[in-house]
């Protein structure tokens, strides 16, 4: 069982991420558009195309109603298609990357509309630099052949023995069988372990229940007509061995001791009760259970009444404390009655016998919550367009509110209904709300003003609230710079642009990060591939006609700063070496493996303790971060996204010289101080979701 399942449940669930949310971090945004997403005049990028696909696993296909979604007329690589294929394999058939690596065969075929096709091996990890147009693809068929032959062979070598379970004279139909290896010599002790296992899983009978039972035995019926009865309570076994192929079936019989419970049930006295909550009474099938001895007092009786109020009607101690009425009436069989207040801490010293009680009536009248809640209708107009709003602003508690309270409510519904947050309001041309009173007056409040109105007003005097926002164009905050990417002389049209902030000057080092980000996002070229490329550079074309060429492989940058508004466009050019993969493998093979123990929340042996470093005598915290994240993902399935959603993910590095250092795995930047991997004594990781 993976450690991830110990510390999180429905991340699951709960956990939902969209690839679109990463556009800002990838620094490759669509062309400038206004904040108002409801405007029909905005350009939303590519139109979509649906490509049908099939999945065949071990020769079996399933009907798949969904399709793979791509941008229409977009140039994509086979690596992009492979990512899509792996995603649907995992989603539709539960086949992970590890399953693919261990499979006999894993490939997909791209069928083009011109009749040609291309077969790609999912296990190879080698991708051609060719780009294909999504509109040329007719269909995609996926074929995976997993290694199940060994399991099939084992299944044939197994024998299924039917069994029955009888508990207290009652039998249930059991469709499963006991599984043994064919013609295996087993002892009665082994057979007993199997019997105890099915007793626990099918009927919930444990070893303790068997020891306390009146009778517990199982009968082995052989194919030759003989049988053997074994006492499950004895713990004594014969040394005889039996052949699994000679067993016909097994009958299990258990008789538990229920007499004590039956006797106890007879001495309990049942008292009927009813609950009247705010004038409404519901039928209650259960009774209050009391023992004949000893006598009970009214304090214990009050505790029982409060318990059924909580379980049957959800009325807690707090609700009772603020209730208008809260009492119960005890009716006796002799015609008398007694009223007890649930909020009183004074009890009489009288004792009452449960046999003398005829019934108990509980009456509770809670404070009406309607008076404490007030609703004010509102409208929202963004850039002159108003949508009908069916909900109202809800005010609870005090009947008087301040303009500061109203402002918080207004900002909340702007965020919830129209997706306008604090940042958009800050740069909006206009952001106001108007409070219309029932006496005909009105008050206009600026949402961006920090001046607070000290006046308090009654919510019941407000007729409605009109919210008006005019967003400023995002171009005032951001500039969108067009760019091109040429890889090995091949250029593909790119509809998106680099999104750069206008609020401050930018340097070549910052621009380098943006360029590397779009190279990785658009063409799948990472830092290692850039390192081994023949040429990797980009040219900045300024609006004044000047150009500046920057080498992506160099770590030396000029200190010049310039305005984003002065950039006309950026051309990116990468020439890859044909033997880069071999060179990369050669470097990887030279990596030095360093061992040190790693624990997660105090548990050891959950992740690998062996890490490969290219330069173990010269690493940074960032290098260690990458290795730990990789180990968490591969060994425990904890991804970078899971770490981002966690409440706390830190690790402490203990060095051999006695020093230690605490680092945050969620942080983007770490200390650049260099140290030796061989100096690490151990690493303790703490994850809290």
Curated annotation (Swiss-Prot):
Gene3D superfamilies the record matches: 3.10.20.120
Keywords carried by this UniProt record: Repeat, Signal
Signal sequence residues: 1-30
Swiss-Prot/TrEMBL MAP repeat ranges: 45-154, 155-264, 265-374, 375-474, 475-584, 589-689
Classification via Pfam families: MAP (PF03642)
Family matches, as InterPro entries: MAP_dom
Domain notes from UniProt: Each MAP domain contains a 31-residue subdomain that shares striking sequence homology with a segment present in the peptide binding groove of the beta chain of the MHC class II proteins from different mammalian species.
Biological role stated in the UniProt entry: Both native and recombinant protein bound to labeled vitronectin, fibrinogen, recombinant osteopontin and fibronectin. It was also shown to be able to bind to a 15-amino acid synthetic peptide of vitronectin. Map could affect the severity of arthritis and osteomyelitis in mice through a T-cell-mediated mechanism and could play a role in abscess formation through a T-cell-independent mechanisms. It could potentiate the survival of the bacterium by modulating host immunity.
UniProt protein name: Protein map
Gene that produces this protein: map
